[in-house]
Amino acid sequence: MPENPAPDKLQVLQVLDRLKMKLQEKGDTSQNEKLSLFYETLQSPLFNQILTLQQSIKQLKGQLSHIPSDCSTNFDFSRKGLLVFTDSAITNGNAQRPSNNLTVSGLFPWTPKSGNEDFNSVIQQMAQGRQIEYIDIERPSTGGLGFSVVALRSQNLGEVDIFVKEVQPGSIADRDQRLRENDQILAINHTPLDQNISHQQAIALLQQTTGSLHLVVAREPVHTKSRTSINLTDTTMPETVHWGHIEDVELINDGSGLGFGIVGGKSSGVVVRTIVPGGLADRDGRLQTGDHILKIGDTDVQGMTSEQVAQVLRNCGNSVRMLVARDPVGETSVTPPTPAALPVALPAVANRSPSTDSSLYETYGVELIKKDGQSLGIRIVGYIGTAHTGEASGIYVKSIIPGSAAYHNGQIQVNDKIVAVDGVNIQGFTNQDVVEVLRNAGQVVHLTLVRRKMCSSTSPLERSSDRGTVVEPSGTPARYVTGAVETETNLDGGDEETEERMDNLKNDNIQALEKLERVPDSPENELKSRWENLLGPDYEVMVATLDTQIADDAELQKYSKLLPIHTLRLGMEVDSFDGHHYISSIAPGGPVDALNLLQPEDELLEVNGVQLYGKSRREAVSFLKEVPPPFTLVCCRRLFDDEASVDEPRTTETLLPEMEADHNVDINTEEEEEEELALWSPEVKIVELVKDHKGLGFSILDYQDPLDPTRSVIVIRSLVANGVAEKGGELLPGDRLVSVNEYCLENTTLAEAVEVLKAVPPGIVHLGVCKPLVDNDKEEESHYILHSNNNEDETELSETIHDINSSLILEAPKGFRDEPYYKEELVDEPFLDLGKAFQSQQKEIDNSKEAWEMQEFLPPRLQEMGEEREMLVDEECDLYQDHFQSMDLYPSSHLQEAAPVSSVKELHFGTQWLHDSEPPELQEARSMMNMYSQETQQYGYSTENMIKENFGIDSLPSISSSEGNSQQGRFDDLENLNSLTKSSLDLGMMIPNDVQGPGMLVELPAVAQRREQEDLPLYQLPRTRVVSKASAYTGASSSRYTAGACELPEREEGEGEETPNFSHWGPPRIVEIFREPNVSLGISIVGGQTVIKRLKNGEELKGIFIKQVLEDSPAGKTNALKTGDKILEVSGVDLQNASHREAVEAIKNAGNPVVFVVQSLSSTPRVIPSVHNKANKIANNQDQNTEEKKEKRQGTPPPPMKLPPPYKAPSDDSDENEEEYAFTNKKIRQRYADLPGELHIIELEKDKNGLGLSLAGNKDRSRMSIFVVGINPEGPAATDGRMRIGDELLEINNQILYGRSHQNASAVIKTAPSKVKLVFIRNEDAVNQMAVAPFPVPSSSPSSLEDQSGTEPVSSEEDGSLEVGIKQLPENESSKLEDISQVAGQGMVAGQQKALDCPTDNAVSQMKPQKYSTKVSFSSQEIPLAPAPSYHSTDVDFTSYGGFQAPLSVDPATCPIVPGQEMIIEISKGRSGLGLSIVGGRDTPLDAIVIHEVYEEGAAARDGRLWAGDQILEVNGIDLRSASHEEAITALRQTPQKVRLVVYRDEAHYRDEENLEIFPVDLQKKAGRGLGLSIVGKRNGSGVFISDIVKGGAADLDRRLIQGDQILSVNGEDMRNASQETVATVLKCAQGLVQLEIGRLRAGSWTSSRKTSQNSQGSQHSTHSSFHPSLAPVITSLQNLVGTKRATDPSLKSSGMDMGPRTVEIIRELSDALGISIAGGKGSPLGDIPIFIAMIQASGVAARTQKLKVGDRIVSINGQPLDGLSHADVVNLLKNAYGRIILQVVADTNISAIATQLENMSTGYHLGSPTAEHHPEDTEEPLQMTAG
């Protein structure tokens, strides 16, 4: 039977919880039922009663032998199982009373009858001469006894004494008037509280008593009448203490704060902990450290916690009046308690004993008295030394907390060694053991310490460092101290231990600062020396003075107006952690940046004499906002990491053996808590790889260190198929890389880690890796550091890298280095980095040697650690410096000015084709490129194959020259949204950075004409003008190409890199350009059969693109072509897969006019229509291949080609294949042996639509997984039958996908050959991890339709039939569906090669006359309703005709925002941020991202198009329709220089008041507390809004207010035009009931706006009035349906979609419009389908309920069923319904789809129009006309 049933039961429950979690993670659900049953049994009341009864029986047996002869043995058991004794009579002083049943916790009572000498003697002994009182209190049937107790440990024998802490006024105990505060309870119900009774048992005795409570108490003689000043926390002095000094202090807050800090608790009182030097309290002079705060204003704060007192202070306003007390007096002088968790000391008895070692050491004893919940006030540190330096081992005093018991004692000094605690020798104990001994010690602690005789006393400065600086014990060799494993421990106890520790850490420096003596010197030197003394030698202190004149905030703001105002003032952002404030980023060009002194990760200590160190972030930021210039900043920078801090203990290499042998590595409690965050095992495993000419065969990324957000770690991202790492089998993706040979990678950036890996010579490489922790098993903690990161080591490392890679490293431009926001970099395709070696002297180049190194450039400093960045470190070529000796093409200044491109660039090399007449520089450049070509041949590849297979490039441009077929080498700097390049290498030549700016067009008259005869490609098509002689050897300068926008941005230095997820190509359009005599067309082109840019999903941009358009040229005059447009066709010649040369020739040979078919990038995915017109027809002389190419291309965007990682195609040799297959399968099974589940390896044959798989990611966005969520019944996967829904893909064709996104898998499937090898694992728990629930009907279901959810054959007259399975998906807010090509959110068949050839509304207007016949089938299997109504499978045939001329696209940079339509706009940020403030998000009732304010100094205000109230739907392709508030802020913060937004402006949202839903909120403001909310005012205009709601406050408990609500009035006083300060003052001064009038943006209107605007942009009407608008196929409706299902309905959030009926109540006045449009009914053209809501108007009363949705089926109106009613009947019902209208509705997926279709059809008609002549309910006629 358990000794302690309750704790044991709790422990078993915790073990069960952990066991269930582990089984769930492994996917094992077989034991769930048993575990649940076990869990329920343990928690059942019956089981608890059995436990209690067993315990009572055991206790009874133990007591029976001790029953006195005169004691009653009558006992019973209560219903709960407790032991109950019955006594006949008890003695209470002189009174005799009958006894009730007394429940005691199994402890036998001793009744104090006359003659019971045993009981009386025990009581007398416990009273120790004090007055004894016998008290009886009748316990009421309800409520408590009215007093509280506190348990304190006494000095003798470590007993726990119970004292009365407080008697509540008016309670039973108070009315009895016998029980008093400070009484010690000696016995409860005749049970003496001696050493046999624990504290918990005593409390149980009090709580479980029924009837009368019999107490025996001991009381000291009363010395004072003061009850409020009794000190309850010192058992050695229970006498009352009253204060020697009480003072009334009044402080007037000047805005800078009160200037003092408080700590404490209910038991010890709240005391002044610190006084800020120079602060208000310090200047006033009356308040002192240690003062007890008794009263604030009229509020008695005794018994409050420090947080409650702080709230009272905050509510006081500007004037704060306090009653404080100090210097308690009584029989004994007692130091008043300082902070709650700090000890209060009595004068210690000095027991200095004779020195044990008269020559070196003296031993002395110290007695410290600590109070309950408080510490001794010392920090200890443990040193691990060797045998011959015993003095370096042991526990030493590291620092002493000012005001603590140790501090007041005065005998303990820093560096004293603790040898014994209460007589227990602690030598040889670990830190943790010593901590436990000290914490478990009694009230009086006897310490025995040893001190070196010649040790001088340390200064307060040495005691005060909490930054990990260890003061070296005298006589201890330095090398052991710096390498010590140090665990700094604060010896706290009680509930406030953590708070106390943090308070102590924050305030050490404050205490030390008070004791510093000023040295006459310059202010800067004085500050510097003061902080240097304080921090020690490990930190460099910097003093910066900024005498700024802030003329314009816009000049300082570089990123976003969402950054706080202090960033504008100082030009830097600050991150705060536990009182430390670190510079996280520095704005380029800002005041701090101009100093060139500070850098990110420096800590900000002080500003203008006010110390920020130790302050909260709110205090620090508030101060930085207000502090006036000039600014004097004091910052520090850590110099070394030799010494471990408290939070990260580690040791240097020299001590590693001792640590491993001893296993006594000390960890404090904070570190144990942090271990829960660790992702990797602390054990370092050494992996040996042999580096060959291809590299190590893995790629890396950096990842935020979970234990330290300011650092990053290097993680293996993926392995190259058949690479060195994969063959070794010991490395896996996710392993943490900590060292390479002797180089430690701790605290290195990603770029530095890549350089280290590249610098390693071929041969054996030793990698230190940490494996990920599995199943939360925590191994034995051991700390390590492989290489000491001091300055000397860093210098050595950088010099080594420089020696090896001196020709690779190009200095990053300063602006780029300071950019704080980075995105993931796909760098599997390196670019050529031209380094310093180009400046060296000329020397002959040996063509046989390897000459080129391909690498990715990334800035050396990465400020933002939250994002992942990756680099490829394989496919290396050995580098020899002498290969570059002759490449002094241009002066060094050009090279240093040229900024490397931080995105992926392509590089091709060919054979030498230049003539001798060319300049030598060109020949040299060409020869170097040839070397690379020869080098790749040595590997067994042709240049083309190598680049094709390893870098994802399909082919190289083939050029016919006089020397035979060769490959042209060129290097086009195509820049995406964030590229920084100012240089280019074109036709194998360097271009100086100063050539008349980027994008300049250059003609080459002499060289160009000569090359024309050789059929060489030229970028400039016409012939005559010379633009610049300075660039006579250049083909073209830097081009700009945007992978996510229609127009390429002007890019500034300092902007970061962003790689879009996927491209969204707009529809093809036709542009005609008429030639002019002797004038060029004015365009330059770039591209060809080469991959230009790889996107995040693996898609590769490839083709012919417009590089630049001259303004005054024929092309420029059309205003139809832009940089970045893709040319699909020129005058009938298809350029989709043309080489660069073919494109040039096609343009040259085109007639007049030149007819281009081009595409521009769009920010949203669209289904692209076919394009057929006269310009598209195939020329008679085109061969059949060209015709086939053209048909393949019709209307489709370029398909993704290859994944980023290099992929080597399998060998053709069948024998080798068999052997390698077996070997590979074995390796695969070894690689994934640790993963839970069943591993499968299969091969499938793709068909024309791919594999027939739909993929999705993990529900947990922090984990990358690829799950199968749907299998097309007609696809290869379903035919094979081995794959199931829920399988997780690990590899495709030896390409490791484990740990990558599902977009990557899709891209691999699409580009894979016909035979696909899949490795996947099957886990039962996978369904719970998938981001998207499996499609409802599996392929094996007999009820499934032909294609599971309906197919959509789309036929056109000229294209063949194309069939694709579209799945209607259940709503899931966290879904991240596979997005194949241009179809968003529909889970299309993965591997589909063609985009669906369906027009959207927008695309219809841009098509030539053509005919579509679209059959739409709605799947009934999606609706789990029984019985299924007949309308579930309605077929609707739509036929549309259109004859529209394709218009030119609207320029998003200038187009106005049309209300009621989704608009795409572009805004260039310039030198400021966007300047937007937003509200809303899916996690708020607003459920949409809405602009709250447009700041006048921001880019949006300068642009002038965005208004407050506009809804933001997308930001640079990131969909915000279902984003949370934080996700939207993140997306807006990380925008590049040119921002592309999709916005929607509701037509009804022109008048502010109309947008608001106004409602009253009454909050009860309690005395001493606020309302629990923060407010903020608009910078421009009026209005005060709620910015934050405090947890636990009145507003939070009320649960009606949200962030973004506007306060319209307070207690009837209008606040619409009031300032923030006015509203704050009114709210602070309000008392009691506070009546607020709140305005909130209507959520219904935004929801409706989003729904009705899905396809509004660009929707066209037929030019023939007899035809209705063209209807988009239902795929667009399904897309809209998925997009419009929102989490507004709580049922959706919990279970996907609530199919049950809902009752909606609408209050409608006579003048109100109901605001809904209905469709359906008996006899409807849509069929006899039920009445459903077709539209909801934002301005109607129905929208205000926020409970109705488009597509809801109306079951009844005011109780009248609608079954069998016609449309007109229901319209009349609604028209005549006023007052209280009760609608019963039900959500229906099929109805929703039809409703959404009708929305699309009705665009442009009167639906919801406020100007409609008839009621909005009556909308059937136009709907019928449209649908007919």
Curated annotation (Swiss-Prot):
PROSITE patterns: L27 (PS51022), PDZ (PS50106)
Keyword set includes rRNA processing: no
CDD domains on file: PDZ10_MUPP1-PDZ8_PATJ-like, PDZ11_MUPP1-PDZ9_PATJ-like, PDZ12_MUPP1-like, PDZ1_MUPP1-like, PDZ2_MUPP1-like, PDZ3_MUPP1-like, PDZ4_MUPP1-like, PDZ5_MUPP1-like
Subcellular location(s) per record: Cell junction, Tight junction; Apical cell membrane; Cytoplasm, Perinuclear region
Pfam assignment, any one: PDZ
Sites of Phosphoserine modification: S459, S522, S645, S1211
Entry keyword annotation includes Phosphoprotein: yes
GO biological process: establishment of apical/basal cell polarity; microtubule organizing center organization; positive regulation of epithelial cell migration; regulation of microtubule cytoskeleton organization; regulation of protein localization; tight junction assembly
Compositionally biased residues, Pro residues: 1196-1208
Region of interest (Disordered), residue spans: 1168-1220, 1333-1362, 1645-1669, 1805-1828
Matches recorded under InterPro entries: L27_2, L27_dom, L27_dom_sf, PDZ, PDZ_scaffold, PDZ_sf
Key words, A-Z: Cell junction, Cell membrane, Cytoplasm, Membrane, Phosphoprotein, Repeat, Tight junction
Recorded GO CC terms: apical part of cell; apical plasma membrane; bicellular tight junction; cell leading edge; cytoplasm; perinuclear region of cytoplasm; plasma membrane; tight junction
Annotated ranges, domain L27: 5-65
Modified residues (Phosphothreonine): T1535
Major localization listed first in the record, in broad terms: other
Coiled coil regions, renumbered to chain: none
Biased composition (Polar residues): 1345-1354, 1645-1668
Domain spans labelled PDZ: 134-221, 248-328, 365-453, 553-639, 686-758, 1070-1162, 1241-1324, 1464-1547, 1560-1642, 1703-1789
PANTHER family per record: INAD-LIKE PROTEIN (PTHR19964:SF11), MULTIPLE PDZ DOMAIN PROTEIN (PTHR19964)
Function field: Scaffolding protein that facilitates the localization of proteins to the cell membrane. Required for the correct formation of tight junctions and epithelial apico-basal polarity. Acts (via its L27 domain) as an apical connector and elongation factor for multistranded TJP1/ZO1 condensates that form a tight junction belt, thereby required for the formation of the tight junction-mediated cell barrier. Positively regulates epithelial cell microtubule elongation and cell migration, possibly via facilitating localization of PRKCI/aPKC and PAR3D/PAR3 at the leading edge of migrating cells.
Record text about domains: The L27 domain (also called Maguk recruitment domain) is required for interaction with PALS1 and CRB3, and PALS1 localization to tight junctions.
Subunit structure: Forms a ternary complex with PALS1 and CRB1. Component of a complex whose core is composed of ARHGAP17, AMOT, PALS1, INADL/PATJ and PARD3/PAR3. Forms a heterotrimeric complex composed of MMP5, LIN7B and PATJ; the N-terminal L27 domain of PALS1 interacts with the L27 domain of PATJ and the C-terminal L27 domain of PALS1 interacts with the L27 domain of LIN7B. Component of a complex composed of CRB3, PALS1 and PATJ. As part of the Crumbs complex; interacts with WWP1, the interaction is enhanced by AMOTL2 and facilitates WWP1 localization to the plasma membrane.
Name recorded for this polypeptide: InaD-like protein
Source organism of this protein record: Canis lupus familiaris (Dog)
Organism ancestry: Eukaryota, Metazoa, Chordata, Craniata, Vertebrata
